[in-house]
């Protein structure tokens, strides 16, 4: 220990303390200004107007072979674009390499059938030939399913499957929801809907979804209330489709939760008992009571009587376990059910022989008046059975109220018996709702949700956002580039001429204004600050990176968290998006490699919007296009000043590179050991050696002086032996860092010094 401190003194402890004090003082200043909209991770906007229900799957899919993420939503007149987008069924194909989304309209909204309704969101399937299949239906409005196929950059014409004409005897109930699955062992594609007899029905295809036939009815119940059950599905893609269901709507009945699965054209209980020997004929259609009970109404957990259950998510894993998350009302009066019940989250797990249940925490009150059981929902991780995410107005760590719906990550080390929680969003101004995680792989996670104001399923002002966690890469600290006359022109290349400079709001004259006293560099470029707004010309800021390589890029703008300030930006003119502060995160202390201004007077803060990734080969410069858009949200073209203003400050970029290289050594250690890194001090690489006496899961991470995670070097099961890990710290600033290793019950921290 003394040698470590002596070493630090030799390289300049005064310099390190100076850096640390600057960071700490900036941190104190930022949080004394009531910083809001904090997110753990790089927040990405996928669609500026959209929401989804949770009974259509898959809502999001990853095409790893082509590097795409595909998602679907329904748009609202209350969001960006106003009434012309109302009810549009939309698909977004997000380029995972470039970090840029492309939005398509699958079906334009209209007032008769496809009016705005989040139940109309599409489901997707990546076909065996690489084409994308999208399926959607209108909520409670007709008896049809609609589908389109994406190939070579184009969505084909819409095709209609009319259940009333395709089902023998017709259909007596409207079609809602879409759930697409392909079983390679059968060569069949399935789509499950709510339809005839208010029950789950299926259609199937033997040509990957080009044409379809009626299949059958999955279950049947006596008619009670709105419909006969809600179904969540998951498939292994080979020979089995699992489903979790309720018997009715929890508003109409004290519902329980059941499980079954389809295999070889038959329906089974959890333990493999056949309850329907042919799902394609109407002779034997089981009821939900014939399936395996997962969680019965009136069950007691932690002294709380749970009633009126509803399913949220289901997932099967390679080891044969099945997991589901449900919600239930806590201590509700069965004789006089609450109109605003106390909803709770419950985790259920099947270990191959029995179902068990674990209380997770409070889910919060209803989302809006007529839907007492609508909550923020939850998501199981398809590639990690030990990880879940929930959306709640209560912190699951202590049940304290957080005001709005926040996203929390739960991790278990004992098969779901207990959970450790980490907040993903904090101090949000608006709700974060309905998280979803598509299947990817063990090293990559996509977490998506939508953020905004949810008035009803037919009226919302929300944007789809999310985080991509890719363990194979590291993103260094950001570098900030202030937008000035030296690097910013009009997009056509002509000189930027502004009004000002002064400390006042700029006039509504369709010209950018230089407003002093805010931002980095002492000013911001502003538009639409007063009156009925304005339309200033598009800008282009040129950024010089230090070298060739891959860089993530953000635009920085200022906003009042409770207003609707925004900026339009992109790496190309055609790729520009409108970013409102409600769908963005605030910049935090420590994000950049130098101290920058994060807060201003009048409850203003610096926000960031992710624009994508640039690949620089020989040239080390790139352009960012920036514009205003003072059109009032919820209208197609009404300009407005003040609330829709733009305050542009500058651009941030960060180097992207591989995390580490790992070398395994043939040794037989007797104990857990974390050695001091070598060399130390170092620039830019150092090697960390650790030894394991047994096979164990290892977490090896680097933290800065504030305790913020800088890099994950190892996070996986490792074999016994001695291993070398190299940390590439080319994007880290000078200073002290800590390397922490956790392996089983072993934990140790060492100091490292980056000196540049």
Identify the meaning behind each predicted range.
Residues 713-745:
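Short, surface-exposed loop/turn motifs with a glycine/proline- and acidic-biased composition
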Residues 647, 746-750:
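Extracellular and select intracellular beta-sandwich modules with Ser/Thr-enriched
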Residues 663-678, 682-702, 724-727, 743:
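Glycine-centered coil/turn sites that cap beta-strands in beta-rich domains
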Residues 751-756:
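Short beta-strand edge segments in extracellular beta-sheet folds
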Residues 33-477:
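Extracellular, repeat-based ectodomains that mediate carbohydrate processing or recognition
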Residues 321, 405-408, 460-461, 468-469, ...:
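Extracytoplasmic
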Residues 1-14:
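N-terminal secretory signal peptides that target proteins for export/translocation
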Residues 17-29:
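Bacterial N-terminal signal peptides
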């Amino acid at each position: 220990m003394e040698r470590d401190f002596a070493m630090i003194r030799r390289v300049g402890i005064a310099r390190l303390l100076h850096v640390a004090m600057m960071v700490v003082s900036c941190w104190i200043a930022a949080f004394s200004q009531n910083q809001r909209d904090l997110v753990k991770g790089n927040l990405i906007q996928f669609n500026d107007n959209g929401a989804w229900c949770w009974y259509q799957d898959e809502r999001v899919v990853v095409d790893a072979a082509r590097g795409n993420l595909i998602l679907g939503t329904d748009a609202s007149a209350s969001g960006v674009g106003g009434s012309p987008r109302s009810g549009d069924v939309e698909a977004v194909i997000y380029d995972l390499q470039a970090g840029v989304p492309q939005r398509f309209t699958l079906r334009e909204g209209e007032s008769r059938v496809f009016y705005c309704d989040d139940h109309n969101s599409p489901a997707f399937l990546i076909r065996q030939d690489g084409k994308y299949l999208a399926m959607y239906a209108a909520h409670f409005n007709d008896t049809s399913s609609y589908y389109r196929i994406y190939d070579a950059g184009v969505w084909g014409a819409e095709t209609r499957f009319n259940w009333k004409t395709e089902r023998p005897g017709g259909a007596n109930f409207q079609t809602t929801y879409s759930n697409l699955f392909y079983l390679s062992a059968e060569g069949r594609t399935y789509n499950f809907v709510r339809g005839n007899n208010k029950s789950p029905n299926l259609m199937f295809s033997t040509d990957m979804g080009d044409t379809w036939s009626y299949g059958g009815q999955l279950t049947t119940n006596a008619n009670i209330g709105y419909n006969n059950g809600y179904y969540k599905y998951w498939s292994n893609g080979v020979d089995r489709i699992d489903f979790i269901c309720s018997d009715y709507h929890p508003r109409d009945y004290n519902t329980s939760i059941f499980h079954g699965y389809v295999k070889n054209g038959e329906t089974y209980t959890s333990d493999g008992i056949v309850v329907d020997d042919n799902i394609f004929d109407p002779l034997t259609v089981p009821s939900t009571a014939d399936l395996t009970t997962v969680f019965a109404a009136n069950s007691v957990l932690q002294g709380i009587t749970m009633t009126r259950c509803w399913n949220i998510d289901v997932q099967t894993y390679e080891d044969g376990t099945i997991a589901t998350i449900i919600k239930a009302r806590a201590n509700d009066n069965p004789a006089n059910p609450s109109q605003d019940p106390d909803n709770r989250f419950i985790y259920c797990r099947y270990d191959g022989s029995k179902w068990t249940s674990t209380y997770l925490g409070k889910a919060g009150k209803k989302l809006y008046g007529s839907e007492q059981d609508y909550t923020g929902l939850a998501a199981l991780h398809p590639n990690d059975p030990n990880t879940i995410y929930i959306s709640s107005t209560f912190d699951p760590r202590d049940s304290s109220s957080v005001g709005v719906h926040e996203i929390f990550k739960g991790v278990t080390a004992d098969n779901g018996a207990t959970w450790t929680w980490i907040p993903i969003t904090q101090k949000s101004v608006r709700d974060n709702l309905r998280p979803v995680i598509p299947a990817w792989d063990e090293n990559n996670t996509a977490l998506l949700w939508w953020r905004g104001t949810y008035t009803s399923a037919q009226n919302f002002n929300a944007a789809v956002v999310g985080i991509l966690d890719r363990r194979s890469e590291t993103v260094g600290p950001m570098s900030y580039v202030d937008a000035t006359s030296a690097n910013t022109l009009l997009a056509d290349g002509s000189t930027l001429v502004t009004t000002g400079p002064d400390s006042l709001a700029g006039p509504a004259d369709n010209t950018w204004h230089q407003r002093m006293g805010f931002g980095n560099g002492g000013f911001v470029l502003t538009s639409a600050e007063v009156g009925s707004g304005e339309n200033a010309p598009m800008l282009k800021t040129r950024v010089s990176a230090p070298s060739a390589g891959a860089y993530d890029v953000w635009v920085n703008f200022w906003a009042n968290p409770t207003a609707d300030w925004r900026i339009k930006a992109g790496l190309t003119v055609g790729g520009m998006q409108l970013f409102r502060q409600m769908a963005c995160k605030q910049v935090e202390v420590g994000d950049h490699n130098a101290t920058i201004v994060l807060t201003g007077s009048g409850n203003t803060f610096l926000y960031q919007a992710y624009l994508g990734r640039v690949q620089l080969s020989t040239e080390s410069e790139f352009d960012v296009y920036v514009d205003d858009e003072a059109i009032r949200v919820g209208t197609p073209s009404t300009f407005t000043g003040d609330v829709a203003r733009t305050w542009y400050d500058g651009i941030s970029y960060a180097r992207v590179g591989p995390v580490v290289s790992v070398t395994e050594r043939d040794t037989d250690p007797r104990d857990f050991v974390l050695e001091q890194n070598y060399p130390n001090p170092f620039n830019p690489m150092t090697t960390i050696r650790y030894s394991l006496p047994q096979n164990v899961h290892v977490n090896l991470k680097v933290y800065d002086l504030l305790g913020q995670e800088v890099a994950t070097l190892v996070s996986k099961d490792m074999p016994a032996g001695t291993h070398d890990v190299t940390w590439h710290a080319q994007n880290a600033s000078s200073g002290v860092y800590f390397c922490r290793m956790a392996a089983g019950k072993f934990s140790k921290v060492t100091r490292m010094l980056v000196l540049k």
